Amino acid sequence: MWKLSAILLVAAASAVVIPGHREAPALTGQALIDYVNSAQKLWTAGHQVIPKEKITKKLMDVKYLVPHKDEDIVATEVSDAIPDHFDARDQWPNCMSINNIRDQSDCGSCWAFAAAEAISDRTCIASNGAVNTLLSSEDLLSCCTGMFSCGNGCEGGYPIQAWKWWVKHGLVTGGSYETQFGCKPYSIAPCGETVNGVKWPACPEDTEPTPKCVDSCTSKNNYATPYLQDKHFGSTAYAVGKKVEQIQTEILTNGPIEVAFTVYEDFYQYTTGVYVHTAGASLGGHAVKILGWGVDNGTPYWLVANSWNVAWGEKGYFRIIRGLNECGIEHSAVAGIPDLARHN
C-alpha cells in the first residue's frame, strides 16, 4: 500500500507547475516577494530583517554541492512500511538535540552545523537516550579545515567530510554562543536581529573569520571534562541513496540526516508553507538537517531544520517539496552511525 501512496505523492509533486516569467530570475526585493506570492500558493514569501548581502555570508560556495556518484552511495535499503508523515521530534521526544534550532550567525558554517546537529540526534537515538547532549559545530568548523579535509571553514565545506572527521577524530560537546553549553560552544555571536527578546549588535561588514582550532575546552562556564575525554565518535560515514524512499528509510532507521542544496533569492524570503523555487537568482550553497516529511493539501514535503535561528521561517524550520530533487536537495544526503563503544 505504501508503494501506491508513494507513487501518487510523486505524481502530485510532479504536477506542481510554477507559471514562468522571463524576468523571474532577475527579480529581487519587494518585486520578488510580490511575484512569488502571486505565482503560486504553496508557500509565502515575506520581508526579512537581514538583507540579501548578509544572507550570502551564511552560505557556501556551490562547489561544495557536488551530487554523490552512484558508486559512493552506501545506504540504499527501502523500508516496507514508510508512513505518510514522520517527525523525528515526535519519534524521539527525549533527545534534546532534535528540537534544537541553532544560529550560525555571519559565517558559512552550515555544513558543520547540519552535521553536528544530525550527529547529536543519532548519538542520542543509538544510545536510547543514554548519551543525550549537543555536539559541537565549532569543533568541526575550526579543526576540519585545509585542502585534504572538510573545506574552508566559514567559506564552506563538504558535508561528507564532516562526517568522516567525526569517525576519525570525534566531536566534543558544544551548544550555542548564548548558552555556552558543553566543552566547545559556538564562538561567533548572533548579529543583526532580535531573537527571543534579545537584540544583537549589527553584523560586521565582512564575513566572520573561521575560529582558530584549539585542543581544549573553550566554554566560559568552565566545563569540567577535558577536551580529549569529551570526544564522541562515529563508526561509519556514508552517502545516502538519491531516491525518496531510501532517504526516508535512513531517517526512520537511524535518525535525521544532512543534505545540501542551492539557495535562490526567494528562499531566504520564505516565511511559511512548502517551498518550491519560484524566482530570483542563485545565491550559493547551503547545508541543513532533514528530520521528517509529510503531506500538506496533497503536496509532499520534507521537514527541515535550518540554522538561521528561530526568528526565520517556521520557527527555524522550513518545508520543501519532496520527490522533485528541488534545488538538488535529494542528491546529496549524508549520514553515519555512532560508535558508542568508542565514546570517551
From Swiss-Prot:
Entry annotation: catalytic residues: C110, H286, N306
EC numbers: 3.4.22.-
Assigned GO CC terms: extracellular space; lysosome
Domain of life: Eukaryota
Catalytic EC class: hydrolase
Pro-peptide region(s): 16-81
N-terminal signal peptide: 1-15
Intrachain S-S bonds: C95-C124, C107-C154, C143-C213, C144-C150, C183-C217, C191-C203
Listed CDD domains: Peptidase_C1A_CathepsinB
One of the GO BP terms on file: proteolysis involved in protein catabolic process
UniProt entry tagged with the keyword Signal: yes
Keyword annotations: Disulfide bond, Hydrolase, Protease, Signal, Thiol protease, Zymogen
SUPFAM superfamilies tied to this protein: Cysteine proteinases
Pfam families named in the record: Peptidase_C1
Similarity remark: Belongs to the peptidase C1 family.
Name under which the protein is recorded: Cathepsin B-like cysteine proteinase 5
